[in-house]
Regions:
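A positional/architectural concept
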Residues: 8-70
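Hydrophobic/aromatic residues in well-formed alpha-helices
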Residues: 6-9, 90, 123, 128
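Short, positively charged
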Residues: 86-124
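Hydrophobic residues at beta-strand termini and immediately following loops
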Residues: 29, 78, 126
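Non-catalytic DNA-recognition/assembly elements of restriction-modification systems
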Residues: 1-36, 130-174
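Short, charged, solvent-exposed linker or helix-capping segments at domain edges/interfaces
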Residues: 40, 87-91, 137-140
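A short glycine-rich beta-alpha junction/loop motif
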Residues: 69-74, 110-137
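A short beta-sheet element
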Residues: 55-96
């Protein structure tokens, strides 16, 4: 396992200022696209990299449906060698990893701004531990599956609540 700075293994591309983009609205990468990619609504393919939402400090793999979209300045595209980094492992480390959380907290110390937006320099200076690619795949796939399972459980809880409310209304009407 090696520990490396992100800027040593990832090529970052900052999104464009929205006022300078001439693309159609449907060609822009939106926060909804980000959430859909993270929650596996769209299918992903290896080698497409990841997107970091700089406002939320979250990371998601790029899906086939959003790979050609133009990203705005609230997003950072991450391209890397798929033989070195597995996208879902990187997302797990960025979104849930204790090491990243501690490094980001240290960066935010002394910041008085209410919006603690990350920047490309700070992200590049974060360190990541890179185990062998097979271990990354195992961790990343488990992380992806946990997101899918959580979403299914939330949906099931919503359905149970709707059903219960329907029963209550029927009893109340009698």
């Amino acid at each position: 396992m090696e520990s490396v700075y992100l800027n040593e293994v990832i090529q970052f591309t900052l999104g464009k200022n929205p006022t300078r983009i001439r693309a159609q609205v449907d060609e822009l990468y939106t926060p909804e696209d980000f959430e859909n990619d993270l929650h596996c609504i769209h299918s992903t393919k290896e080698g497409m990299g990841c997107i970091i939402n700089l406002i939320k400090s979250k990371c998601s793999p790029i899906s086939e449906q959003t790979e050609a979209k133009c990203i705005t300045s609230n997003f950072l595209r991450c391209d890397f060698d798929i033989g070195k980094i597995y996208a879902w492992y990187f997302c797990y480390q960025f979104n849930e990893g204790k090491s990243f959380e501690q490094q980001i907290e240290m960066y935010h110390q002394g910041t008085t701004l209410s919006v603690k937006k990350l920047n490309i320099k700070t992200i590049g200076e974060l360190k990541i531990i890179l185990p062998d690619i097979q271990k990354q795949r195992t961790i990343g796939n488990l992380y992806r599956q946990s997101i899918i399972q959580n979403d299914l459980m939330v949906k099931q809880a919503e359905n149970v609540r709707k059903f219960t409310m329907t029963l209550i209304r029927r009893i109340d009407e009698d």
